[in-house]
């Protein structure tokens, strides 16, 4: 009698032997050297970084913005490197929700319109409008739909940013929080919202941060330092 072998889960992001160089007129700076990474499709994963250029390069590679490197990148089994620019943009816009410490809005538009116009290629306008209202309700800010961004508090704006990321029902959330003008309260609230989304919606989270004041529990911590990855925290 044969045993049942569980199929290997497709990784959320899978990077293999990534070599990335930043070329300028004077020299070629090594950003990544043989970088290999698998991000679990169910986990809340934290990547701690030190260098902004490494963080930016990593986000651009896993989201398909940058394919100027050697190696292989997969997103949910999709081989990013063979897709053209339009295909990569479509994959990114439909399947990844982005949330950052600094989130930009159209100040002349209300909350509803800021979210509405952020969704590309929406064919069913009625369905989209219902999705926006339901998403605002899930974040507890449905009464703010007609408010302009400049009239909202920092916490309320962050909830709007999360609503904008979630309204398209993404396969994952990529979040970035840097320690410029760091506020522990703001960071803790940012983490609280991420944890809530991960728990309530079962959406995998990838948080990339250079903050050291971490009052949180995640499934995996990875350190990005000098173009290499290490399991756990590394000083």
Regions found by a protein language model. Give the residues of each.
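Conserved ABC transporter NBD signature motif
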Residues: 71-80
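ABC ATPase NBD coupling module
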Residues: 80-97
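Q-loop/switch helix immediately C-terminal to the Walker
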Residues: 102, 109-121
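Conserved ABC ATPase "signature" region
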Residues: 127-144
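Conserved ABC ATPase signature
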Residues: 148-156
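Hydrophobic anchor residue at the start of the ABC signature
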Residues: 161-162
């Amino acid at each position: 009698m044969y045993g049942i072998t569980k199929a290997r889960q497709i990784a959320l992001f899978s990077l293999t032997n990534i070599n990335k160089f930043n070329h300028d007129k004077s020299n070629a700076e090594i950003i990544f050297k043989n970088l290999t990474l698998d991000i679990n499709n169910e986990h809340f994963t934290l990547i701690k970084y030190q260098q902004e250029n490494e963080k930016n390069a990593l986000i651009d590679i896993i989201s398909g913005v940058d394919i100027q490197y050697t190696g292989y990148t997969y997103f949910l089994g999709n081989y990013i490197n063979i897709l053209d620019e339009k295909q990569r943009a479509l994959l990114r816009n439909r399947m990844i929700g982005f949330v950052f410490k600094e989130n930009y809005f159209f100040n002349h538009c209300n909350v509803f319109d800021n979210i509405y116009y952020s969704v590309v290629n929406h064919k069913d306008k009625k369905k989209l409008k219902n999705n926006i209202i339901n998403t605002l309700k899930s974040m507890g800010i449905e009464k703010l739909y007609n408010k302009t961004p400049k009239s909202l508090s920092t916490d309320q704006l962050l909830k709007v940013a999360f609503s904008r990321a979630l309204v398209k029902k993404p396969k994952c959330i990529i979040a970035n929080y840097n320690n410029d003008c760091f506020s522990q309260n703001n960071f803790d609230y940012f983490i609280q919202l991420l944890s809530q989304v991960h728990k309530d919606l079962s959406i995998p989270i990838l948080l990339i941060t250079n903050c050291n004041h971490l009052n949180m529990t995640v499934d995996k911590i990875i350190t990005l330092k000098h173009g290499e990855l290490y399991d756990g925290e590394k000083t």
